[in-house]
Regions:
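Conserved small helical "lid"/interfacial subdomain of P-loop NTPases
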Residues: 59-84
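Sensor-1/coupling segment of RecA-like P-loop NTPase cores
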Residues: 10-53
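The conserved phosphate-sensing helix
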Residues: 80-99
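Conserved nucleotide-binding/hydrolysis micro-motifs of P-loop NTPases
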Residues: 10, 43-48, 66-69, 94, ...
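Accessory nucleic acid-recognition modules appended to NTPase machines
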Residues: 102, 108-276
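Walker B catalytic acidic pair
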Residues: 6-8
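A cross-kingdom feature that marks ATP-driven nucleic-acid transaction machinery
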Residues: 202-362
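N-terminal positioning helix adjacent to the helix-turn-helix/winged-helix DNA-binding module
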Residues: 53, 82, 134-138
Length: 362
């Protein structure tokens, strides 16, 4: 038995027939010696952040941010590419997404929710950090260092200039990871104790906030439209590029069934000396896959596949598997030369933003 109680706090105010139905279900489960689970969900007035279940069960449930496809119903835009940009800005945190107005453009949402005086989400990043840590300055510095995209330990250390040794970064990264604000990844071909790790902000909205909104809070000169045009627009594609690869990895993990016949049972990336592969893993069918992601630039012709082949040869991940799929994820319509090169190979595919979003490509 699984009982899901949405807005569980209303149960005590409900009519007796509601509590009677719940009681009868529990009695039946107990009589039949069945395992039963009770899942409760309740509205919170907190503007953003982790929601803790207060009750007698003694459990805490941390809900991850929504994936790109799961967040689509809340994102403004008219094309798949628009939706990728919107996800790169507002991410997948439900308490953020509920404030987004789908009837206006992404730029208008950015101004209204993040840049205008008393904007609803302007202090969201502060609220998340400052209720869990007493001295947030270095935590802000770490998150700001990661806001420009996934990076390594040394780069994070350089972003916190008052720390004299790289080892001093550890407690801040570990605390942020424990709070669910930072994620750590290893290359799929690395051992569990490998120090070759990369760190990223856990949700695109938090990265966007630390990259663009926090500096605005510290310097409010100029109006919101000027800041949007001068500070955000020129760097928005760079920011979205960092998010696009994660969207591609999400697709392989959760939504590849309709294209490749199964989702990935292992999904991540590969990097090392002489190779960098944005999306890689093993499908449920046992086939290995390797893909690179192109948001800003358009891949051209067969040389794009050749470069991917060379990167695959530089590591042994998936070596010996009967089928090894090459994938090119592109945010723009692929040129004819690339389509021809892919069509000549049985183990190569092109995935556009429409497929990632579960709709027709542009």
């Amino acid at each position: 038995f699984v009982i899901v109680l949405d807005d569980a706090y209303r149960l005590v105010h409900g009519r007796s027939r509601i509590s009677d139905a719940v009681t009868l279900t529990l009695q039946r489960a107990r009589a039949e010696d069945r395992t039963f689970h009770i899942v409760t969900a309740s509205h919170t007035s907190a503007p953003i952040g982790r929601e803790r279940l207060a009750g007698t069960f003694g459990s805490e449930v941390n809900v991850e941010p929504l994936s790109f496809r799961a967040a689509l119903p809340f994102l403004p835009g008219t094309t798949p590419r628009d939706f990728v940009r919107s996800y790169g800005t507002f991410g997948g945190i439900p308490n953020v997404l509920r404030s987004v107005d789908r009837s206006v453009t992404l730029s208008t949402n950015i101004r209204n929710l993040l840049l205008e005086p008393r904007a609803v989400l302007a202090d969201a990043g502060r609220d998340w950090i400052e209720r869990d840590v007493q001295n947030p300055t270095r935590y802000y510095a770490v998150l700001s260092a990661l806001a420009g995209g996934e990076t390594d330990w040394a780069t994070v250390h350089r972003g916190v200039p008052d720390l004299t040794t790289s080892g001093q970064v550890a407690p801040y990264l570990h605390r942020l990871e424990g709070l669910g604000l930072v994620r750590t990844r290893r290359s799929l071909d690395a051992g569990p104790r490998s120090r070759s790790r990369r760190y990223r902000v856990s949700d695109p909205f938090l990265a966007f906030w630390h990259r663009f909104v926090l500096p605005r809070l510290n310097d409010t000169r100029g109006d919101s439209t000027s800041y949007l045009n001068d500070a955000i627009r020129p760097s928005r594609d760079d920011h979205t590029h960092n998010v696009f690869a994660e969207i591609c990895r999400q697709f392989m993990a959760h939504d590849a069934l309709g294209v490749f016949g199964s989702n990935a049972r292992e999904s991540g990336s590969l990097w090392g000396s002489g190779y960098e592969i944005d999306s890689a893993g093993i499908l449920g069918s046992g086939a290995a896959f390797y893909g690179n992601c192109f948001w800003r630039q358009v891949p051209h012709g067969g040389e794009t596949l050749t470069a991917l082949d060379e990167a695959i040869r530089e590591n042994r991940y998936g070596f010996g598997r009967e089928h090894r799929q090459r994938i090119l994820f592109t945010a723009r319509p692929p040129p004819r030369a690339l389509k021809r090169a892919v069509a000549k190979r049985h183990n190569a595919s092109i995935i556009g933003p429409g497929v990632l979003a579960g709709m027709a490509d542009e």
